[in-house]
Amino acid sequence: MGQTNVTSWRDFVFLGFSSSGELQLLLFALFLSLYLVTLTSNVFIIIAIRLDSHLHTPMYLFLSFLSFSETCYTLGIIPRMLSGLAGGDQAISYVGCAAQMFFSASWACTNCFLLAAMGFDRYVAICAPLHYASHMNPTLCAQLVITSFLTGYLFGLGMTLVIFHLSFCSSHEIQHFFCDTPPVLSLACGDTGPSELRIFILSLLVLLVSFFFITISYAYILAAILRIPSAEGQKKAFSTCASHLTVVIIHYGCASFVYLRPKASYSLERDQLIAMTYTVVTPLLNPIVYSLRNRAIQTALRNAFRGRLLGKG
C-alpha cells in the first residue's frame, strides 16, 4: 500500500527534545531563564522608550518596534517548547502547527525589514545630519514600520501556504521543537522540489532585499566616516552603528543557514543548534547588545523605576 494522507485526523508530534528526563529538566531551567530575561528586557526597553520623551526619536522608535517584534516571535515558540520540556503534551494540531509557522515566519521576516529600516535611519543620521529631522519625519517613520510589518506578514503567509498546500504522509513526527519550514517540509509526500524552490525564493527575497538596503546604507556610512578628519570623530560615528551591525550579522547569519539550504543538506543536530541560537539567543541580543549598553536607555530605565517607586511611596 502507498503512503496515506493523515493530516485531517492526526496531530504532529515534536521530537526535538527526546532526551533523558534529567537533561530535559536542565534544558527547561536554562531556556526558562533565558526566556524570562529576553521577555523582561524587551518589555523594559519598550516601556522606557515610551515613558522617556528624550527617546521619542526615529532610532528609538524602530528599536521599540524591533523589541516588540522579537517579543512576539518568542511568545509564539518558546512557551510551547517549555511545556514540552516540562513533560507536557508534545503533540500539536494541524491548524496549530500552521498558525505557529505563520506567526514565527511573519515575525522573523518583519525583523529583517525593521533592521533594514534601522540601517536607513543610521545612514540619514550620519550622512545627512543637518536634514535628519526633516528626512526622518513621523510620516516616513510610520510608513517604514507599517511596511515592515505588512510585508513580513505577507511573506509569512506565503511560506505557510506553500508548506500546508502539500499532503503529509503517515509519518507525523517533527524532528524539531517547533513548526519550522525545513522539518515540516521533510514530512511531505511525493516530490517536494517545487515547494522547496518556492520556500527558497521567498526566503531569498526577504533576506536579499532587506540585506541589500542595509549594505547600501552602510556603504554610504563607511564613505562618510572615512571623510571625517579626526580618529576620535570616526570612532564616535562608527560606535553609533556597531550594535546594529552586530545584531544584523548574527540575525542574517543564522537565518541564511536555516532557510537558504536545500532539503538534502538538512541535519537534525546541527539545525536544532542553529535554530536554538536564532530562536532563543538572538532575541536576547537585541536588548543586551543594542540597548542595555546604551546610556540613554539605562537612564530611561532608572527614571522609570524611580518614578514608579516614588509613585508607590
Swiss-Prot record:
<feature type="topological domain" description="Cytoplasmic">
    <location>
        <begin position="218"/>
        <end position="237"/>
    </location>
</feature>
<comment type="function">
    <text>Odorant receptor.</text>
</comment>
<dbReference type="GO" id="GO:0050911">
    <property type="term" value="P:detection of chemical stimulus involved in sensory perception of smell"/>
</dbReference>
<keyword id="KW-0325">Glycoprotein</keyword>
<keyword id="KW-1015">Disulfide bond</keyword>
<keyword id="KW-0472">Membrane</keyword>
<dbReference type="GO" id="GO:0004984">
    <property type="term" value="F:olfactory receptor activity"/>
</dbReference>
<keyword id="KW-1133">Transmembrane helix</keyword>
<feature type="transmembrane region" description="Helical; Name=2">
    <location>
        <begin position="55"/>
        <end position="75"/>
    </location>
</feature>
<dbReference type="GO" id="GO:0004930">
    <property type="term" value="F:G protein-coupled receptor activity"/>
</dbReference>
<feature type="transmembrane region" description="Helical; Name=4">
    <location>
        <begin position="140"/>
        <end position="160"/>
    </location>
</feature>
<feature type="topological domain" description="Extracellular">
    <location>
        <begin position="1"/>
        <end position="25"/>
    </location>
</feature>
<feature type="topological domain" description="Cytoplasmic">
    <location>
        <begin position="121"/>
        <end position="139"/>
    </location>
</feature>
<feature type="disulfide bond">
    <location>
        <begin position="97"/>
        <end position="189"/>
    </location>
</feature>
<dbReference type="InterPro" id="IPR017452">
    <property type="entry name" value="GPCR_Rhodpsn_7TM"/>
</dbReference>
<feature type="transmembrane region" description="Helical; Name=1">
    <location>
        <begin position="26"/>
        <end position="46"/>
    </location>
</feature>
<feature type="topological domain" description="Cytoplasmic">
    <location>
        <begin position="293"/>
        <end position="313"/>
    </location>
</feature>
<keyword id="KW-0675">Receptor</keyword>
<dbReference type="GO" id="GO:0016020">
    <property type="term" value="C:membrane"/>
</dbReference>
<feature type="transmembrane region" description="Helical; Name=3">
    <location>
        <begin position="100"/>
        <end position="120"/>
    </location>
</feature>
<feature type="topological domain" description="Cytoplasmic">
    <location>
        <begin position="47"/>
        <end position="54"/>
    </location>
</feature>
<keyword id="KW-0297">G-protein coupled receptor</keyword>
<keyword id="KW-0807">Transducer</keyword>
<keyword id="KW-1003">Cell membrane</keyword>
<feature type="topological domain" description="Extracellular">
    <location>
        <begin position="259"/>
        <end position="271"/>
    </location>
</feature>
<dbReference type="GO" id="GO:0005549">
    <property type="term" value="F:odorant binding"/>
</dbReference>
<feature type="transmembrane region" description="Helical; Name=6">
    <location>
        <begin position="238"/>
        <end position="258"/>
    </location>
</feature>
<feature type="transmembrane region" description="Helical; Name=5">
    <location>
        <begin position="198"/>
        <end position="217"/>
    </location>
</feature>
<dbReference type="Pfam" id="PF13853">
    <property type="entry name" value="7tm_4"/>
</dbReference>
<comment type="similarity">
    <text>Belongs to the G-protein coupled receptor 1 family.</text>
</comment>
<protein>
    <recommendedName>
        <fullName>Olfactory receptor 10Z1</fullName>
    </recommendedName>
</protein>
<dbReference type="InterPro" id="IPR000725">
    <property type="entry name" value="Olfact_rcpt"/>
</dbReference>
<feature type="glycosylation site" description="N-linked (GlcNAc...) asparagine">
    <location>
        <position position="5"/>
    </location>
</feature>
<dbReference type="GO" id="GO:0005886">
    <property type="term" value="C:plasma membrane"/>
</dbReference>
<keyword id="KW-0552">Olfaction</keyword>
<feature type="topological domain" description="Extracellular">
    <location>
        <begin position="76"/>
        <end position="99"/>
    </location>
</feature>
<feature type="transmembrane region" description="Helical; Name=7">
    <location>
        <begin position="272"/>
        <end position="292"/>
    </location>
</feature>
<feature type="topological domain" description="Extracellular">
    <location>
        <begin position="161"/>
        <end position="197"/>
    </location>
</feature>
<keyword id="KW-0812">Transmembrane</keyword>
<dbReference type="InterPro" id="IPR000276">
    <property type="entry name" value="GPCR_Rhodpsn"/>
</dbReference>
<keyword id="KW-0716">Sensory transduction</keyword>
